[in-house]
Amino acid sequence: MSKVFKLNSEFKPAGDQPEAIRRLEEGLEDGLAHQTLLGVTGSGKTFTVANVIADLNRPTMVLAPNKTLAAQLYGEMKEFFPDNAVEYFVSYYDYYQPEAYVPSSDTFIEKDASVNEHIEQMRLSATKALLERRDVVVVASVSAIYGLGDPDLYLKMMLHLSRGMVIDQRAILRRLAELQYTRNDQAFQRGTFRVRGEVIDIFPAESDDYALRVELFDEEVERLSIFDPLTGQIESVIPRYTIYPKTHYVTPRERILQAMEEIKDELVERKKVLLDNNKLLEEQRLSQRTQFDLEMMNELGYCSGIENYSRYLSGRGPGEAPPTLFDYLPADGLLVIDESHVTIPQIGGMYRGDRARKETLVEYGFRLPSALDNRPMKFEEFEGLAPQTIYVSATPGNYELEKSGGEVIDQVVRPTGLLDPIVEVRPVGTQVDDLLSEIRQRVAINERVLVTVLTKRMAEDLTEYLTEHGERVRYLHSDIDTVERVEIIRDLRLGKFDVLVGINLLREGLDMPEVSLVAILDADKEGFLRSERSLIQTIGRAARNLNGKAILYGDKITPSMARAIGETERRREKQQLHNEEHGIVPQGLNKKISDILELGQGLAKNKAKPRNMKGRSIVEDDPAHVDLTPQGLQKRIHQLEAQMQQHAQNLEFEEAAQVRDQLHQVRELFIAAS
């Protein structure tokens, strides 16, 4: 079989990586359904996974617990596989308020949502890649377990065009309208088409930098070409092309008509139940809302909140699992669950919260009972659909350990030779004064400190106390949004302040090589924030520094502390032994400080077409952009789009293309920020 994945890296597997790669690949080839990779902080887990993907040549989905880590993984995978389809699939809502009813105050809250067009385009691109290619890595958030259009209906709706095909212009335009494309002869943008004589230009919904030109002659497709929608320059002539629907939720007309009949039948049954229970108001409300939706579906082919009828539109039975991104993944696909100790419980919790809200809507006549089937997957359904799975975590949960039969693949030795931090336990009585003296020692040699406490009040008091004693301190709390949080972490690394105080925000996925001390106050207070996994994750924040040290303040050693200290010492001994055997001298990490915010640079460089000019890199030339909030970046995107269109109208195509290259980069920054 020809090799489709091409791994691009200047590094070769080192430390525990070669053994981990070998064992993972053997397990997958032997048909093991579940494997757990215990990879410590800084051991190159993503690189190990990338090697497994490249060697086994299988389409892969990587699940991350949140958008920040998904963006980070997407950036890393994009660098490892520049010539393959690395896709990004997260929730496309910038803002989402689901419809809800509060019976106590008789308040109905309408659904309100703001969709991010760029992320919608990336989601469409992800499903297209899974349907068309084998060399695909989709990095997804837990959004992947939510209902998506049925892949069978989606495939049925595609429009295939090929050179020499006999089809008249009206038939093409009718099919485009069914795919929910709109005609716009003035503003040519994603999801639209324009007609000029016998030429139809189509801007595919999943594309952001190319369009399709269909030239007809005497009811026959004479030529198909890919062109730059900005400059109009033809880039290639192609023999065939497939146009995908504008949305995942597109449905054939006959299916809509059939669904409408089924909805009417359910409405009659439900009205009878409500009237029998003397719920006249609910019966009237349900009848009015459903009739309005049916009218809209009949006239337009869709209605607001059409997802509530998804059971009928996809032809499923009551209680059946909704189609999701997993239905698009080939049968021999591979699933990698990153930070599995966080992601797995998240998957389990999604269904229950959604169900409680919908039951109230059904009970009070806002929705038909079939709306309960518009839901995320249940955990059991996820287990049934998941292909061969690799769980990746520094602290695997009980579920992962049980599923992989207690067999854990250790990736403890880092390629850099860095050791896990030294762990000390000190008494609580003098913890604040002791911490102050430790901070001063670190500040004197230009190193940083993380401090984790139990409550918001303690964090505020400690921040105030340390500030009064002349230390440069910031406090990270739950009210701070993702972008500001990333900026605070970057400022800490840059040395704008020396100490960061937090509660539960100093855990997974934060790379800060400058941090040499992690202080855990009140470590002996057994609970979620001081569990074995939380302690190991927090101690791991100092594992990227040559002088890494963790101080646990506690008057007694709890079972969680004992296990966390024992595990850290086990890892440290293994790392030391490996270094001695191979004559390795530990090297400090020298990671670029702007890494997480430069998500889009590699992508923009890959996507930008070779031109006879130097497209200015916004990220490199204008650091102000890195500080922008999602709102600021969105505004900048609109400004650049307007600027680009203006250049195109003035026939200044080189300048327009230059602005377009900048636009790519700002969009990718926006993904990291959103």
UniProtKB/Swiss-Prot annotation:
Domain UVR: 634-669
Main location: cytoplasm
Subcellular location: Cytoplasm
Binding site for ATP: 39-46
Gene Ontology biological process: nucleotide-excision repair; SOS response
Domain Helicase C-terminal: 431-597
Record's keyword annotation contains Hydrolase: yes
Entry annotated with the keyword Cell division: no
Annotated CDD domains: DEXHc_UvrB (cd17916), SF2_C_UvrB (cd18790)
Alphabetic keyword roster: ATP-binding, Cytoplasm, DNA damage, DNA excision, DNA repair, Excision nuclease, Helicase, Hydrolase, Nucleotide-binding, SOS response
Residue window of motif Beta-hairpin: 92-115
Domain of life of the native organism: Bacteria
An MF annotation (GO) of this entry: excinuclease ABC activity
Residue span, Helicase ATP-binding domain: 26-183
Xref: InterPro entries: Helicase/UvrB_N, Helicase_ATP-bd, Helicase_C-like, P-loop_NTPase, UVR_dom, UVR_dom_sf, UvrB, UvrB_inter
GO CC terms in record: cytoplasm; excinuclease repair complex
Alphabetized SUPFAM superfamilies for the sequence: C-terminal UvrC-binding domain of UvrB, P-loop containing nucleoside triphosphate hydrolases
Function field: The UvrABC repair system catalyzes the recognition and processing of DNA lesions. A damage recognition complex composed of 2 UvrA and 2 UvrB subunits scans DNA for abnormalities. Upon binding of the UvrA(2)B(2) complex to a putative damaged site, the DNA wraps around one UvrB monomer. DNA wrap is dependent on ATP binding by UvrB and probably causes local melting of the DNA helix, facilitating insertion of UvrB beta-hairpin between the DNA strands. Then UvrB probes one DNA strand for the presence of a lesion.
Subunit text: Forms a heterotetramer with UvrA during the search for lesions. Interacts with UvrC in an incision complex.
Record remark: domains: The beta-hairpin motif is involved in DNA binding.
Family: Belongs to the UvrB family.
Name of this protein: UvrABC system protein B
Designated gene of the protein: uvrB
